[in-house]
Amino acid sequence: ETDGEIVACIAYRTFAPGVAEMKRLYVKPAHRGRHLGRILAETIINITRERGFDKIILDTMVEMKAAQQLYHQLGFYMIPPYDDQDPERIVCYEKQLQAKFHVKIVAA
C-alpha cells in the first residue's frame, strides 16, 4: 500500500496435502522495478514454509518473462502442467520448501 492505494498483491492456497499454490502475484505497472514482487513472493515462500508445506507451485503466462526470471532467482524450477493448464500459454514452476533428508548425529 502506498498513500492508501493498494499497489501489489499476492495470495496462496492449499493445492494438495503439503502443497501450496502461489496465486495472484501482481504489481501495478507504475510501481514495478521496486522489488515489490520479490518481497511478496519471498513473504509467501516463508509463510508457507513456516506453516509446514513441503513445496510451493505456481503458474504464469509464457509471455511473463520478468516473472519467470524472478521465479528462477527464487529457486523455482519448471515442471509439467499440474492443473489442466495449456502448455502453449502457461508455464508451471515448483520450489521445495522443506529438506527431504534428515541428519542423524551419532556420538563416537
Each language-model region and where it sits:
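Short polybasic/polar patches that bind polyanions
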Residues: 32, 49, 72
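Residues within alpha-helical segments
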Residues: 42-45, 49, 61, 68
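C-terminal "cap" of GNAT-fold acetyltransferases
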Residues: 54-57, 61-108
